Amino acid sequence: MDNIEVRGARTHNLKNINLIIPRDKLIVVTGLSGSGKSSLAFDTLYAEGQRRYVESLSAYARQFLSLMEKPDVD
């Protein structure tokens, strides 16, 4: 996997956004206030990463952790 793909992101101000982000690179997201930068970074990418990490843990360990909602993506 050389890229992180986001398809159809619909979190807060994001309206069916598709993007490909290269892995192991420094990425900068810029835009106007309210354009969805934080929605992309925290509510989509971070939330999905945390969800996948927690799902990889044992059922015993998962019971002690709160899980973020799955992002609204395709």
UniProtKB/Swiss-Prot annotation:
Positions of transmembrane segments: none
The entry's keywords: ATP-binding, Cytoplasm, DNA damage, DNA excision, DNA repair, DNA-binding, Excision nuclease, Nucleotide-binding, Repeat, SOS response
Compartments where located: Cytoplasm
GO cellular component: cytoplasm
Key word DNA-binding present: yes
UniProt main location, coarse: cytoplasm
GO biological process, any: DNA repair
Residues involved in ATP binding: G31, L32, S33, G34, S35, G36, K37, S38
GO molecular function: ATP binding; DNA binding; nuclease activity
The protein's role, per its UniProt record: The UvrABC repair system catalyzes the recognition and processing of DNA lesions. UvrA is an ATPase and a DNA-binding protein. A damage recognition complex composed of 2 UvrA and 2 UvrB subunits scans DNA for abnormalities. When the presence of a lesion has been verified by UvrB, the UvrA molecules dissociate.
Protein name, entry field: UvrABC system protein A
Gene: uvrA
